[in-house]
């Protein structure tokens, strides 16, 4: 679960992490008033669920309130396109107005989940303000990584080692140690999958400030925090993702034209890879989970068909907990309800597989059965080419 920059900064500030003075605004008039509060000279920052806003024209330095208002009028309602949004971009509905500071040095700091070790990982670099992936490619020696033992937690000496590695000393070094420890505390208590501060700066006056911040929460822990659902900006989400969430379906929109329905995240990833291998382009990632009912399968299928980019559907199911005949019934029910004319290939195996195949072949749908994953992928690509 993602949140906006201004929300991330509100959370960080409650943990004693210093952030610039700021105000969030929903209208150009509010932006102008906020700019006056900042003394006129300030930064106007579009709030969207994506990075790369500066390069897309979403971050502007202004010198007086009227200019801030003019910039806001340009940004509100505009779709910002960055490398993280896809070609459709994300619409700007909120703007953060923030004071300017004189920066002496910039750093990168983040705590994220390391999937390989299943532990939190602290990443820091003296190359702040840049794309960390770019730094990793060009100057990997400038990135400092620390895997945190969950039993001992992040220790003070480890935080100090990172601060010293960034070239800090004296009082600002100790401030950085405290900031790192507080960031880790925030990660634990708020069930974050990511906290990223980029850049973390030292001002000319010698103060540390989190100039930009990103926080993502673990979706599986949201139930422990009643306030989290109210923090979601649904205007930043794909409508189909919102619908999928209501049925506890994992859905991610992609850029291709083959709709995919799979049970299990690992099998779903393998399905996307095999489709690409045979020249297909997946339109989505959709995991119905291991214990889906006929109704849930039907809703998943209807969600796929609501995407106008989808020109064919590939279903790849292993019926362990799920029965293949139940899957087939859900597909048939949904396809008939929306009068689906698209070519469909179903590859299924497991419980009641023959009953499931029989139901599909007798349904009257434009459906073929895949003998295995590779055969199914080849068939859907071929059917799409003929469509």
UniProtKB/Swiss-Prot annotation:
The keyword Ligase applies. Pathway: Carbohydrate metabolism; tricarboxylic acid cycle; succinate from succinyl-CoA (ligase route): step 1/1. Mg(2+) binds at residues 198, 212. Substrate binds at residues 263, 320-322. Its EC number is 6.2.1.5. It comes from the Bacteria. Gene3D superfamilies: ATP-grasp fold, A domain (3.30.1490.20), ATP-grasp fold, B domain (3.30.470.20), Succinyl-CoA synthetase domains (3.40.50.261). One of its GO terms (molecular function) is succinate-CoA ligase (ADP-forming) activity. GO terms for biological process: succinyl-CoA metabolic process; tricarboxylic acid cycle. ATP binds at residues 45, 52-54, 98, 101, 106. It catalyses: succinate + ATP + CoA = succinyl-CoA + ADP + phosphate; GTP + succinate + CoA = succinyl-CoA + GDP + phosphate. Disulfide bonds: none annotated. Residues 9-243 form the ATP-grasp domain. Binds 1 Mg(2+) ion per subunit. NCBIfam families: PRK00696.1, sucCoAbeta. Belongs to the succinate/malate CoA ligase beta subunit family. Heterotetramer of two alpha and two beta subunits. This is Succinate--CoA ligase [ADP-forming] subunit beta. The gene is sucC.
């Amino acid at each position: 679960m993602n949140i906006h920059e201004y929300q991330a900064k509100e959370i960080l500030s409650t943990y004693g992490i210093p952030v610039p003075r700021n105000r969030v605004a929903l209208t150009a008039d509010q932006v102008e008033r906020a700019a006056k509060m900042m003394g006129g000279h300030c930064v106007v920052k579009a709030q969207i669920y994506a990075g790369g806003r500066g390069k897309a024209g979403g971050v502007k330095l202004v010198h007086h309130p009227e200019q801030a208002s003019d910039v806001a009028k340009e940004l509100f309602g505009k779709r910002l396109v960055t490398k993280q949004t896809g070609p459709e971009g994300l619409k700007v509905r909120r703007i953060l107005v923030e004071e300017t500071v004189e920066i002496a040095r910039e750093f990168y700091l983040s705590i994220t989940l390391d999937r390989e070790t299943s532990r939190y990982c602290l990443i820091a670099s003296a190359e702040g303000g840049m794309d960390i992936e770019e730094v990793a490619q060009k100057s990997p020696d400038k990135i400092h990584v620390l895997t945190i033992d969950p039993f001992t937690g992040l220790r003070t000496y480890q935080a100090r080692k990172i601060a010293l590695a960034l070239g800090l000393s004296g009082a600002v070094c100790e401030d950085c140690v405290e900031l790192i420890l507080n960031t880790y505390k925030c990660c634990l208590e708020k069930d974050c999958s990511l906290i990223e501060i980029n850049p973390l700066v030292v001002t000319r006056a010698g103060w540390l400030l989190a100039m930009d911040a990103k926080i993502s929460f673990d979706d599986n822990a949201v139930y422990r925090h009643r306030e989290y659902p109210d923090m979601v900006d649904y205007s930043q989400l794909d409508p189909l993702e919102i619908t999928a969430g209501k049925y506890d379906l994992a859905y991610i929109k992609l850029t291709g034209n083959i709709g995919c329905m799979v049970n299990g995240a690992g099998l779903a990833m393998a399905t996307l890879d095999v489709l690409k291998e045979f020249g297909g382009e997946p339109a989505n990632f959709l995991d119905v989970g291991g214990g889906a009912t006929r109704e849930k399968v039907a809703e998943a299928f209807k969600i796929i068909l609501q995407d106008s980019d989808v020109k064919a559907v590939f279903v790849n199911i292993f019926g362990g907990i799920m029965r293949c005949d139940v899957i087939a019934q859900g597909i048939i029910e949904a396809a008939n309800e929306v009068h689906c004319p698209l070519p469909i290939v179903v590859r299924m195996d497991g419980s009641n597989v023959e009953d499931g195949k029989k139901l599909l072949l007798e349904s009257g749908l434009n459906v073929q059965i895949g003998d295995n994953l590779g055969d199914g992928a080849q068939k859907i690509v071929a059917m799409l080419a003929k469509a």
